[in-house]
């Protein structure tokens, strides 16, 4: 999965499409979205 090093720095989140895999939970998309891909979110 692609990682976001810009949009999820404080959360150290993983950039991936929904749904997030357990035990990660979706904490986006705004403002923690993955670059230009709104279908991708920040999972942490």
UniProtKB/Swiss-Prot annotation:
Key words, A-Z: Disulfide bond, Nematocyst, Secreted
Cellular component aspect of the GO annotation: extracellular region; nematocyst
Tissue expression per record: Expressed in tentacles.
Disulfide feature: 8-42, 15-34, 20-43
Subcellular location: Nematocyst; Secreted
UniProt function note: Peptide with unknown function. Does not exhibit antimicrobial activity against Escherichia coli and Staphylococcus aureus. Does not exhibit any effect on human ion channel TRPV1 in a Xenopus laevis oocytes assay.
Protein name: Peptide Hact-4
């Amino acid at each position: 999965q692609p990682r976001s090093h810009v949009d999820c720095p404080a959360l150290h989140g993983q950039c991936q499409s929904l749904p997030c895999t357990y035990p990660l939970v979706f904490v986006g998309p705004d403002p923690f979205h993955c670059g230009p891909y709104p279908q991708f979110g920040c999972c942490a």
